[in-house]
């Protein structure tokens, strides 16, 4: 290991850079820098040599050319143990650079702004930064490269232990991180620009890059014979399972993560009142609204208490002690919510295996992004199903108008139905599911299962269907069970027949003109 004697520092994110530079100066490291970074370091009392002085060539083209010079890249790429390299460097007056500290122009943050123009995006594509990073990473045996402020402290600790040097093992790890970082950076640029090919700026790009980082290894996958790991996307701010914090409990399983995702996404549908959902195998087995988390949970569990055993529970409100006591009175795999009060957390400790997950507060976050479905050899890419039509905005197709109470129930049922596997049929009142039929190959069978599962009275409830009724038999079955109103997308060639069935039974029927298939 050779002692670091010269470092080139040029960063957009200046977190921790002054402290790092002062520590390097303490080891006698010469600091090269550019632009705003050099200005900041000088203002902090450090001696800095401009890169233009080091290369003998000025910055030009509005700062587009600063470090793209043989004296920079020769100093990074020259192999210290290669005599020919060293001779050529000496011949051309190239001095070695032992450390590079660089992070890149904030392209992703720039294009995330609603008023970002193509020119704005182009000007935030870093050229010199990735080039230096890649040069340093290629010659990682001789050069330490830092692209993440989170690594500054560890490198300084190693330098302290090794007389100002960094090990080859650490340099290799940091180099790998560089290539992961530049791949993600280029992928973001490619995705954003690629979506703007042609006249339609909303086209999907010809090539699509997704960069994810491993959050944790999992014991196994969906089944014990499958290996698995959990990866998360970069820069996620929306409250979701991927940025949830585990406060206690056993290690998350593959199936836990999928069900936690289903739970938190379901309760996001409800903002006006406390909501609770109980999930089994990604399907809701009970959803309810209440005046408090505990009242919502008790009503959700009432729908199907047998299936609720061993389930995963999601809330849209902070969980209090009363809810925690009830949750710990039975066996549950996990709970996910936007927070817990101190007493609730203390109660959960009595059930140390229960996984308690916290997401950021649900209000005020924009829901965006793609939905990816894996097929063998490929990916299907689509926008997430974030659409929702309120029952009051639906078109009434029946002779009878729905009552205000029915409209409230239809709205609740439609929001729940969106999160049930197709074919999906849901019976509800205004704030509680009564029967849920999920995942059947025929819609009428889903209706029959919803009736069979119902422990609460179906008479006077409403029905939601995630897609149109292909025949009137589903409506007839619902009427026989006591349903008074139906919400569905419409769009069948037999819509008139289905509407006529509703009229014959005196039911109200509204069309959403929006389908919510879920596979």
Swiss-Prot record:
Tell me which Pfam families the record gives: AICARFT_IMPCHas, MGS
MGS-like domain location = 1-147
List the keywords (alphabetical). Hydrolase, Multifunctional enzyme, Purine biosynthesis, Transferase
Where does this protein act, in terms of pathway? Purine metabolism; IMP biosynthesis via de novo pathway; 5-formamido-1-(5-phospho-D-ribosyl)imidazole-4-carboxamide from 5-amino-1-(5-phospho-D-ribosyl)imidazole-4-carboxamide (10-formyl THF route): step 1/1; Purine metabolism; IMP biosynthesis via de novo pathway; IMP from 5-formamido-1-(5-phospho-D-ribosyl)imidazole-4-carboxamide: step 1/1
Please give the biological process terms from Gene Ontology that the record holds.
Answer: 'de novo' IMP biosynthetic process
GO MF, any single term: IMP cyclohydrolase activity
User: What CDD domains does this protein's entry cite?
Assistant: IMPCH
Catalysis performed (reactions)? (6R)-10-formyltetrahydrofolate + 5-amino-1-(5-phospho-beta-D-ribosyl)imidazole-4-carboxamide = 5-formamido-1-(5-phospho-D-ribosyl)imidazole-4-carboxamide + (6S)-5,6,7,8-tetrahydrofolate; IMP + H2O = 5-formamido-1-(5-phospho-D-ribosyl)imidazole-4-carboxamide
Reported EC number(s) for this entry are 2.1.2.3, 3.5.4.10
Domain of life of the source: Bacteria
* One annotated Gene Ontology cellular component of this protein: cytosol
What family does the database annotate?
A: Belongs to the PurH family.
What's said on domains?
Answer: The IMP cyclohydrolase activity resides in the N-terminal region.
Name used for this protein in its record = Bifunctional purine biosynthesis protein PurH
Per the UniProt record, the source organism is: Trichlorobacter lovleyi (strain ATCC BAA-1151 / DSM 17278 / SZ) (Geobacter lovleyi)
């Amino acid at each position: 290991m050779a002692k670091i004697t010269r470092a080139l520092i040029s960063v957009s994110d200046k977190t921790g850079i002054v402290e790092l530079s002062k520590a390097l100066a303490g080891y006698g490291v010469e600091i090269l820098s550019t632009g705003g970074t050099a200005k900041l370091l000088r203002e902090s009392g450090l001696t800095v040599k401009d890169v233009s002085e080091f290369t003998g060539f000025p910055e030009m083209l509005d700062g587009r050319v600063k470090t793209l010079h043989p004296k920079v890249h020769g100093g990074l790429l020259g192999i210290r143990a290669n005599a020919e390299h060293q001779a050529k460097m000496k011949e051309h007056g190239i001095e070695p650079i032992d450390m590079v500290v660089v992070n890149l122009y904030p392209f992703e943050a720039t294009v995330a702004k609603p008023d970002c123009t193509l020119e704005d995006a182009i000007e935030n594509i870093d050229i010199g930064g990735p080039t230096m990073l890649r040069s340093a990473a290629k010659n990682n045996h001789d050069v330490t490269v830092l692209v993440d402020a989170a690594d500054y402290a560890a490198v300084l600790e190693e330098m302290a232990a090794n007389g100002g040097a960094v090990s080859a093992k650490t340099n290799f790890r940091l180099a790998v991180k560089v290539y992961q970082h530049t791949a993600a950076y280029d992928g973001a640029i490619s995705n954003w620009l690629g979506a703007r090919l042609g006249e339609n700026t909303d086209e999907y790009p010809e090539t699509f890059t997704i960069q994810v980082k491993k959050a944790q290894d999992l014991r196994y996958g969906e089944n014990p014979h499958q290996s698995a790991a959990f990866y998360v996307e970069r820069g996620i701010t929306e409250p979701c399972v991927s940025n949830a914090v585990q406060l206690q409990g056993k290690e998350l399983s593959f199936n836990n993560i999928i069900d936690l995702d289903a739970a938190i996404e379901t309760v996001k549908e409800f903002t006006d009142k406390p909501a609770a959902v109980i999930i089994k195998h990604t399907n809701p087995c009970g959803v309810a609204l209440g005046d408090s988390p505990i009242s919502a949970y008790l009503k959700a569990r009432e729908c199907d208490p047998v299936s609720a055993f061993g389930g995963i529970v999601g809330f849209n409100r902070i969980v209090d002690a009363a809810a925690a006591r009830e949750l710990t009175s039975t066996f549950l795999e996990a709970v996910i919510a936007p927070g817990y009060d101190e007493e609730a957390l203390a109660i959960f400790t009595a059930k140390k295996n229960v996984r308690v997950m916290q997401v950021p507060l649900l209000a005020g976050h924009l829901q965006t992004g793609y939905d990816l479905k894996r097929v063998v050899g490929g990916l299907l890419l689509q926008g997430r199903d974030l659409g929702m039509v309120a029952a009051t905005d639906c078109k009434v197709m029946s002779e009878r108008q729905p009552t205000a109470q029915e409209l409230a129930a239809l709205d609740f049922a439609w929001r729940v139905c969106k999160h049930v596997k197709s074919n999906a049929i849901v019976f509800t009142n205004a704030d509680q599911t009564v029967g849920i039929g999920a995942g059947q190959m025929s819609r009428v069978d889903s209706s029959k299962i919803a009736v069979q599962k119902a422990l609460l009275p179906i008479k006077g409830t409403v029905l939601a269907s995630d897609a149109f009724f292909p025949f009137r038999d589903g409506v007839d079955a619902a009427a026989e069970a006591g349903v008074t109103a139906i919400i569905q997308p419409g769009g069948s060639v037999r819509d008139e027949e289905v509407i006529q069935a509703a009229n014959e039974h005196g039911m109200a029927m509204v069309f959403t003109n929006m389908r919510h298939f879920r596979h």
